[in-house]
Amino acid sequence: MAERTDWEAKAANILKAELKRAGVTYAQLVERLAAIGVDEKEVNVRNKLSRGKFTAAYLLQCLTAIGVERLQL
């Protein structure tokens, strides 16, 4: 199995931080993703963030669902 890269870890940490900052749980994220047409299950969200394995498109979908308009790296 491939090891998690620093870039994957950074992407996952950014998304987790934005969820925490907005006070959004994984369950709420699933609901918000559904509202923008993204069908996802809570267990899948948890696994993606835990592994850091998701696409840039998924990151953007999540950030949009959370309501993030600006991101500082």
Task: Identify the role of each PLM range.
Residues 19, 26, 62-66:
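Amphipathic alpha-helical interface segments used for dimerization/assembly
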Residues 1-25, 31-32:
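A short, Lys/Arg-rich alpha-helix, primarily the initiator
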Residues 55-73:
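DNA major-groove recognition helix of helix-turn-helix/homeodomain DNA-binding modules
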Residues 35-53:
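Recognition helix of helix-turn-helix/homeodomain-like DNA-binding domains
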